[in-house]
Amino acid sequence: MPRIPTVELSRYLLTGHIASPGCLRARAALPGKNTRVALGGAPLPSRQLQPRQHARYLTTETSFANPSATTSSPAAAAPFRKQLKEQAKALKKSGHKKKKSSDNQTVPGWELTVGIEIHAQLNTAHKLFSPATTSFNDPPNTHVAPFDLALPGSQPLFQPATLIPAVRAALALNCSIQPVSRFDRKHYFHWDQPSGYQITQFYEPFAKDGFITLYARDGIAAEDGEEIKVGIKQVQMEQDTAKTTAQPGDVQWLDFNRVGVPLIEIITLPEIHHPATAAALVRKVQMVLASVDACVSGLEEGGLRADVNVSVRRTDDPSGKLGTRTEIKNLSSFKAVEDAIIAERDRQIELLEEGGEVKGETRGWSLGSTETRRLRGKEGEVDYRYMPDPDLGPVVIGEDLVARLRETMGVLPDQEADQLMERYNLSAKDALSLMLLDGGARIQYFYNVLDSLEERLVADGQAVPEGAEHATLAANWCLHELGKLTDSASSSSCSDPDVLEGLAMTPLGESPLVPSSSLAAILHHLYSRTITAKVAKDLLWAVYRGEIPEGGTTSYIDTHGLWFKELPEEEYAKLADEVIQGEEKILGEFLRWKQGKMKAYPQGKLMFLVGKMMRGGPEGRVEASGAERVLRRRIEEVYLPELEKGE
């Protein structure tokens, strides 16, 4: 057997470069172009520190330096949500209309069956089998240990601390923790896995037999009723692979910072029968993992990846056997999960109705696609040759650790959603949006704002008010008004150079662009009726643009004379009389309501007139609730009696 030249072996191990495809010993070139693989792009970059965002792991410090020190990378891709918006615009322009999701959950005569595999990066300080620290934003190849590169003589060293978020995640998913689990080798060769195998837990995972309950508020299909329970077969620990970035000229850049980062793979039972329910499950799992601080980031940020197995069968099939399944790999958004399942279901049904046969294969899905694409067939599947890892002993998890983690679990998403709806009077949609936004950080931001707001009310000599009015105000602003900032920022029609994109929210629920204390100061004045809602919104924009420093809200209001000087009652009444003139048709609706001819109070018409009062009154002196109160009293006590007399 020929000996591999030392130079060739070194170039592969240290830089990931292979001069020719195929076996290094045979050096047999394959037809077609060669693909060059560069470790982070040519030579190993220096360890010069670069700016990065705050990593999810809270003990990891952020490094700062001149960004020009690194090798330039391709221009950043447009934000994921912006890509979806652009594609929606293109579809609308072309006149192509998609079915509503709610109309596309079933096909008469056919049953869909879906199983899901979710891979989630764990929130840990170190990699799974090396002392190298985890990194998600640092320069490429600066967090790499010898074992991560499979250098000769290096051995795996299991890091026990990685068990903590893994067990916490499994408990949150109602799994049974196994006292003993073992690691196996999954063999395959690819440039993103230097050792030629991945260490996983194929035979003896650390957690089994769990379940997750989905409710109507989670977005499940209407056909599934108010709730559905989906079983979880197992949860296993495994290594992540290197991050591959395609470059022009058939070049792949490899970042080995990600090699060996601990993952958990969550495998559900095939108990899902509607596409919307599958997407809801992935969304719910992400929320559960974030709530117990087990996962680094969400689906759209790359910290969570989903594969789905799809099969169909006729509902009148006497055998009752499931159809042949296909697997769709690496779905990167909740919408992609639902759309890909619908497309693959329809493809399989069409094939079977034409007399064809569904083949077991792996398929792919691209953003904005209308159909799945074939990646490889069953005959092309790799024989992974699973075998126990001889270098790693069994993992023993004590009942004392399990009990301790169960006691310190904290509030899970269902409990938190119930609290937001019952205590703060939020709708189910708003509660879930708060919990999902910014990778789960928006809900913490809301609590920070609420705490700061209540401190200010107490400092004013007020007791923390009973009921949920102030909390509902804070929640609505944290969700809707902050949402308007980011919507405007991401809009392609927004040309304001001062408008930034996103809120740069940290895992601790803070935003350097809109600090929670600044929003609380605005809401304190709004709740106390010392500024109007319009002024409050203008102040929020000023904070976002950096015009108001943290702690400077009150002085800014003073300097610009923005304090609310409310009109006296008689001025409100005069303004109400002015807007009512000529609105006999609207007054007629109020009269029909009073006479019992209409069930619902015409609130929309009332607010239309309030809007006229706001626009017609002195700038900054008309307060909406005061205008509504006076207007309603004038209509019911003055104008309706006059109309009744005239009948």
Curated annotation (Swiss-Prot):
GO terms for molecular function: ATP binding; glutaminyl-tRNA synthase (glutamine-hydrolyzing) activity. Allows the formation of correctly charged Gln-tRNA(Gln) through the transamidation of misacylated Glu-tRNA(Gln) in the mitochondria. The reaction takes place in the presence of glutamine and ATP through an activated gamma-phospho-Glu-tRNA(Gln). It comes from the Eukaryota. SMART domains: GatB_Yqey. Residues 87-106 are annotated as: Disordered. Residues 90-100 have a biased composition (Basic residues). InterPro entries: Asn/Gln-tRNA_amidoTrfase_suB/E, Asn/Gln-tRNA_Trfase_suB/E_cat, Asn/Gln_amidotransferase, Asn/Gln_tRNA_amidoTrase-B-like, GatB, Gln-tRNA_amidoTrfase_suB_CS, Gln_synth/guanido_kin_cat_dom. Its main location: mitochondrion. This is Glutamyl-tRNA(Gln) amidotransferase subunit B, mitochondrial. GO terms for biological process: glutaminyl-tRNAGln biosynthesis via transamidation; mitochondrial translation. Subunit of the heterotrimeric GatCAB amidotransferase (AdT) complex, composed of A, B and C subunits. The keyword ATP-binding applies. Its EC number is 6.3.5.-. It comes from Neurospora crassa (strain ATCC 24698 / 74-OR23-1A / CBS 708.71 / DSM 1257 / FGSC 987). It catalyses: L-glutamyl-tRNA(Gln) + L-glutamine + ATP + H2O = L-glutaminyl-tRNA(Gln) + L-glutamate + ADP + phosphate + H(+). Keywords: ATP-binding, Ligase, Mitochondrion, Nucleotide-binding, Protein biosynthesis.
